[in-house]
Each structure stands twice: as C-alpha cells, then as structure tokens.
C-alpha cells in the first residue's frame, strides 16, 4: 500500500497557495492510488524549535549518556524521520519567502538531517539513507524566478533532498501570484496543468 506524506510549510494557516496546490496534488495522487494512506504534517501547527544548545546537545550526545530531556528531543527527531522513512511519496508545499524556503521548512530539515540516521559519510563521500522515494515540491511564488539568480529555493531543495537520498524530485511552480489578478490566474492554471500531468 502506498503511503503519501504531505508536508505543509507555509507560515499562514489559511489562504496559503502552496498548501492549496499541495492539497490538489495529493488528491491527484490518491486518484491513481485509491488505497493510499495519506499523512499530512503542518509545520506551522506542529512547530519545531530552531536549533539551539539543547537540541544540538541532544543530537550529539551518545545515547547512553543522554538525559531524559535529551532523550525526548531525539525521540521527536526519530519520529519525524520514521514518518519520512515510511512514506513512498512525499509532497512538500513550499512557498518562496525572500528567495528561499520558510523558516518552518528549514527548521524541519535541521531536525531530520542527522549523520548516521538520514545520511552517512563514507570514503566515497556522503551517502543519503532515505532512498527510493518520489518527491513533489509545490512552490508558490509572488514573482517569477525559475531559471533566474533569484531562485535560490530550487537548488537548495534539490541539494538537501538529494543529500538525504531523495533524488527523484519533481517541482510544480506557481509563479507570479503577486503580479496582479491575470498573472495570478495564469500561475494557478499553469500549476494545475502540471498537477494534472502527474
């Protein structure tokens, strides 16, 4: 049975275009996999703390030396990683904020990037350990950035996801959402055309 994990990373709980389009993409995937299990994670509703001394200390303390507080921190990270590991398909709603990803998504990545767990270092270089997954990134943007120097989001996501083993990544863009009603309608139509082709 296929498991689809949808990760919503918008900073808005209502009206986020990336979440709306991610919902539509997940629904399209369900049409092709009627028995699929869907899990939705909202990085806004279930906010993670930014990395600090406590979190880093927990991650880098040997298991047998961790305090109860550190064990709880690592258990949270482990749960997030297990959720990813159990998913066959991952849909990420990723709005572009100031040319990059939301702080919610960056923090989530910080909580799942753990040496020896989601990647490891080898004599041949780093190896991602979360392999064999299909990832869709739905990126909603106020301006138009694809192929431009201002698009630091696409290479960052491609690099990070590849680093942990997720190399089969398809991007769906909704660009120009803040450039007026006509541009916004065109952006949504273009994104929905891409979703229909999935």
UniProtKB/Swiss-Prot annotation:
Its cofactor is FMN. Its EC number is 1.6.5.-, 1.7.1.17. GO terms for molecular function: electron transfer activity; FMN binding; oxidoreductase activity, acting on NAD(P)H as acceptor; oxidoreductase activity, acting on NAD(P)H, quinone or similar compound as acceptor. The keyword Oxidoreductase applies. It is an enzyme of class 1 (oxidoreductase). The keyword Oxidoreductase applies. Binds 1 FMN per subunit. InterPro entries: Flavodoxin_fold, Flavoprotein-like_sf, FMN-dep_NADH:Q_OxRdtase_AzoR1, NADH:quinone_OxRdtase_FMN_depd. Homodimer. Quinone reductase that provides resistance to thiol-specific stress caused by electrophilic quinones. Also exhibits azoreductase activity. Catalyzes the reductive cleavage of the azo bond in aromatic azo compounds to the corresponding amines. This is FMN-dependent NADH:quinone oxidoreductase. It comes from Burkholderia thailandensis (strain ATCC 700388 / DSM 13276 / CCUG 48851 / CIP 106301 / E264).
């Amino acid at each position: 049975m296929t498991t689809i994990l949808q990760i919503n990373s918008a900073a808005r709980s209502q009206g986020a275009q990336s979440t709306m389009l991610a919902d539509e993409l997940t629904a399209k995937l369900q049409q092709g996999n009627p028995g699929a299990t869907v899990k939705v994670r909202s990085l806004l509703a279930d906010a993670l703390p930014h990395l600090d001394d406590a979190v880093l200390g927990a991650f880098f303390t040997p298991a047998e030396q961790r305090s109860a507080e550190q064990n709880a921190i690592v258990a949270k990270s482990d749960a997030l990683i297990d959720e990813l590991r159990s998913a066959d398909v991952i849909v990420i709603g990723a709005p572009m904020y100031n040319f990059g990803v939301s702080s919610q998504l960056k923090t989530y990545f910080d909580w799942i990037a753990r040496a020896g767990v989601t990647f490891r270092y080898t004599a041949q270089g780093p190896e991602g350990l979360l392999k064999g997954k299909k990832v869709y990134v739905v990126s909603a943007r106020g301006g138009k950035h694809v192929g431009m120097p201002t698009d630091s989001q696409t290479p960052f996501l491609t690099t990070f996801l590849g680093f942990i083993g997720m190399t089969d990544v398809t991007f769906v863009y909704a660009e120009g959402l803040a450039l007026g009603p006509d541009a916004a309608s065109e952006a949504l139509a273009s994104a929905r055309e891409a979703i229909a082709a999935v």
